[in-house]
């Protein structure tokens, strides 16, 4: 029997690469990303980070300590164009600069985006300064998110929250119930409704909500995916996921 050595031919990197750091207990974020980017020429990779419950500032900071390790394991020794940290309250708790530093320790050439910073960019792009804020968090964590948006210069016209303490419970909120709850939000004086948390099933109902409420609706995942696509220059408009994606 003859054995023949054949030289392989390797592809060169062509599509932009997205690396998502998803919370281990998040049901929604991967699905939302895939639903938006499935017809685009991008490569999408995911690694999960341990989430500590209950969701408190202290536990969210503790979670962020593993960001470098988790980032490193997304295609080790390969470049990623944009690393996405998939936690709104976690970014607010730890601080964007801290998250960015930890990501770049593993992927120094990568762009970095997070839900909270992406939300600010999206609101500014749409010239929105007054928002109604909805979160699924505990009262204490809800208030920390509220203060973050205030400190970024936004007026909060109303605020509602679920008072859920565990991330895996947030992902189990019934989508139809959520639509009904958000449909009744007090929007007096608001230019938009922002719904926080990557684990809530908001993105699939955003179009319907905007029609029902006759106002702009933004969510953590929507803003995050939009900003990711902006960073990799793939942000052409897309139907079905709210006004933000139609404004590109």
PLM regions: where:
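C-terminal functional extensions of proteins
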Residues: 218-248
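Hydrophobic alpha-helical
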Residues: 179-209, 225
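Conserved beta-alpha
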Residues: 99-106, 110-167, 245-246
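Periplasmic-binding protein-like
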Residues: 80-86, 132-133, 190-197
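N-terminal glycine-rich anion-binding loop in soluble enzyme alpha/beta folds
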Residues: 2-69, 137-142, 146-174
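Short, well-structured alpha-helical segments in soluble
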Residues: 64-78, 177-190
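Glycine/small-residue-rich loop that forms an oxyanion/phosphate-binding "nest" at active or ligand-binding sites
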Residues: 70-115
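Hydrophobic alpha-helical segments within soluble ligand-binding/sensing domains
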Residues: 66-68, 72, 112-127, 222-234
């Amino acid at each position: 029997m003859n054995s023949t050595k054949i030289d392989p031919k390797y592809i060169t990197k062509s599509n932009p690469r997205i690396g998502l750091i998803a919370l281990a207990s998040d049901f929604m974020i991967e699905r939302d990303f895939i639903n938006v980017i499935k017809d685009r020429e991008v490569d999408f990779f995911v690694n999960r980070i341990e989430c500590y419950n209950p969701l408190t500032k202290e536990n969210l900071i503790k979670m962020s300590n593993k960001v470098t390790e988790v980032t490193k394991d997304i295609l080790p020794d390969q470049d990623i164009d944009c690393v996405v940290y998939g936690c709104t309250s976690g970014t607010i708790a730890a601080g964007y600069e801290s998250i960015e530093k930890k990501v770049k320790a593993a992927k120094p050439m990568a762009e970095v985006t997070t839900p909270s910073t992406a939300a600010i960019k999206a609101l500014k792009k749409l010239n929105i300064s007054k928002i109604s804020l909805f979160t699924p968090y505990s009262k204490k964590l809800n208030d920390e998110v509220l203060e973050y948006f205030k400190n970024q210069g936004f007026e909060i016209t109303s605020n509602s929250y679920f008072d859920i303490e565990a991330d895996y419970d947030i992902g189990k909120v019934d989508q139809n119930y959520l639509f009904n709850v958000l449909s009744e939000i007090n929007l007096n004086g608001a230019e938009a409704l922002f719904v926080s948390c990557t684990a809530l099933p908001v993105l699939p109902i955003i179009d319907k909500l905007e029609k029902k409420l006759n106002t702009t609706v933004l969510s953590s995942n929507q803003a995050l995916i939009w900003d990711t696509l902006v960073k990799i220059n793939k942000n052409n408009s897309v139907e079905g996921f709210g006004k933000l994606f139609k404004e590109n």
